[in-house]
A protein has these predicted regions:
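The conserved acidic donor/metal-binding loop of glycosyltransferases
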Residues: 1-3
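Catalytic donor-sugar/metal-binding loop of nucleotide-sugar-dependent glycosyltransferases
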Residues: 101-117
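Active-site donor/metal-binding and catalytic loop motifs
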Residues: 113-127, 215
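Nucleotide-sugar-dependent glycosyltransferase catalytic core
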Residues: 122-137, 224-225, 254-260
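Membrane-embedded multi-pass helical conduit in multi-pass membrane proteins
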Residues: 168-253, 269-334
């Protein structure tokens, strides 16, 4: 499910001139938008959730020779792989464990932080969860295998990365506590912090500001702290269930290979995965209405000692509610009507129909068709529905038979939707190279800053696109 760029081997194979290198890993990048961003209508604004790992974590691990093999977008020395008995199959994932075997065998893994391939990410929330839960279980299984000698054959820097990974695997526990704690405090009348707002801001504000900016700076603005919390919140409770399973039976079979290319044909709310968040959100609304509404309406007297710190509790509850609301909205799968993905490739082209020539350029392009902007000097009135012709991509030397689906004309330009037909194997190969095998502008990593990410998250709640969008069959 990954397509290498034409310069992939040129940028990676040279490392193997040095005999110490056993594997060269490159980042994974995806041509279809992350399901969170797509469902929220933010496809062109927000990065994939793996940006933090490939843009920040992997380069950090590279400094200590502890890079993780990620299953795709890498090159491995065959003799090194054979020396450890081939790919490791003792866990539910093989890539991470194989890289550990290489490292414990005295090997060295390099990381080239350069986009050299494109792949397909999961398109549905359930598939995303299944993939991430399988990764979580595979990461935990490493510490139960006796033939992976992490603590005896790795140096202390490499061991430190594995210790940090253990803490990362238990991050859903911390996330669950942060979601439930303010709710329990409100219902049981025990404020987690007995302090005034100025006192709290004096200590907490510098940390919050530093964390937000340092997180963005250290990741090259590839991922914001707030957007990262949406991912963690959506993943939290399913991950807790998997963690409990792993602690009871580490090698229980709970996941299969990730489905790719599967698209939703109707709106799917995924209540089975998000109902814990919906329950917490409902209890939050009920608690705020009864607790603070009772004070405001005079139903019960204010206890001054109990009320100390309640302003902070209120802000905590509202913030959690916003993050949970975005996580729930992002989990509502929206139907996909296109059979293939389209990309905003602009290239000069020539359309020939019935001995008439139309010049223009592509607005977007896919393996199945394209949208054209045509020169108004042509006789666009002669362009009709279902006409057959030949579309030539002048710069690429590629010509494909096509059919006109729609045509329209404005004051200066004309537009036409084209569907390819009778595409040969050679033509399809050229289309794939044109679409996937080079670093075009739309494939560059998205880098929203923290403020933009927060505003997009707040706007997503008010717009409620996943709920309000109406899709006709």
């Amino acid at each position: 499910d990954f397509v290498p760029f034409t310069n992939f081997l040129m940028r990676t194979v040279g490392f193997f001139q040095n005999p110490k290198y056993d594997l060269v890993q490159t980042p994974q990048f995806f041509y279809n938008p992350d399901y969170h961003a797509r469902n929220l209508g933010l496809s062109n604004k927000m990065p994939n959730d793996m940006e933090h790992f490939f843009g920040h974590v992997q380069p950090s691990r590279d400094n200590g020779n502890c890079v993780i093999c990620c299953g795709t977008s890498y090159v491995v020395r065959r003799s090194s792989l054979e020396a450890i008995g081939g790919y490791y199959t003792g866990c539910c994932v093989e890539d991470y464990q194989t890289s550990i075997k290489l490292l414990t065998n005295g090997g060295c893994i390099a990381y080239v932080n350069e986009l050299l391939s494109m792949g397909e990410s999961t398109r549905m929330f359930a598939d995303f969860l299944d993939q991430r839960l399988r990764w979580l279980q595979g990461n935990m299984q490493v510490y139960y295998r006796k033939d992976l000698h992490i603590w005896t054959k790795l140096n202390w820097i490499q061991k430190s990365f594995h210790v940090s990974l253990i803490f990362f695997c238990f991050n859903p526990v911390v996330r669950a506590i942060s979601l439930v704690m303010p709710l329990l405090s409100m219902f049981f009348g025990t404020a987690p912090l007995i302090t005034s707002v100025p006192e709290y801001l004096f200590y907490a504000a510098p940390f919050a500001i530093a964390f937000t900016f340092v997180f963005g700076w250290s990741t090259g603005d590839r991922l914001s702290a707030v957007w990262n919390e949406v991912y963690e919140t959506a993943f939290c409770f399913p991950a807790l269930n998997r963690l409990f399973l792993v602690l009871r039976n580490p090698f229980a079979k709970a996941s299969t290979a990730t489905r790719k290319g599967v698209k939703a044909d109707r709106k799917n709310y995924n209540f089975n995965q998000t109902y814990p968040l919906l329950i917490i959100m409902s209890l939050t609304v009920i608690g705020i209405v009864f607790h603070y509404g009772g004070y405001m309406l005079g139903f019960w007297a204010i206890n001054q000692h109990e009320y100390a710190g309640k302003e902070i509790l209120m802000v905590w509850l509202i913030y959690n509610f916003i993050v949970m609301a975005v996580a729930v909205l992002s989990s509502i799968d929206q139907p996909v009507r296109r059979d293939v993905d389209r990309f905003p490739l602009c290239t000069f082209c020539k359309l020939t129909i019935d001995d008439r020539v139309y010049w223009g350029y592509t607005n977007d392009l896919s393996e199945g068709g394209t949208s054209l902007t045509l020169n108004k000097n042509n006789e666009l009135s002669n362009l009709k529905h279902d006409q057959e012709g030949l579309l030539e991509f002048v710069e690429q030397g590629l010509a494909i038979r096509c059919t006109v689906l729609r045509a329209a004309s404005s004051d200066r330009f004309g537009n036409a939707s084209i569907k390819f037909r009778d595409v040969t194997l050679e033509q399809n190969r050229k289309l794939i190279v044109l679409l996937y095998c080079s670093l075009e502008w739309w494939k560059e990593r998205k880098k929203p800053n923290g403020l933009d990410s927060f505003l997009e998250i707040v706007a997503a709640i008010f717009k409620c696109k996943p709920l309000l969008n109406v899709h006709k069959n």
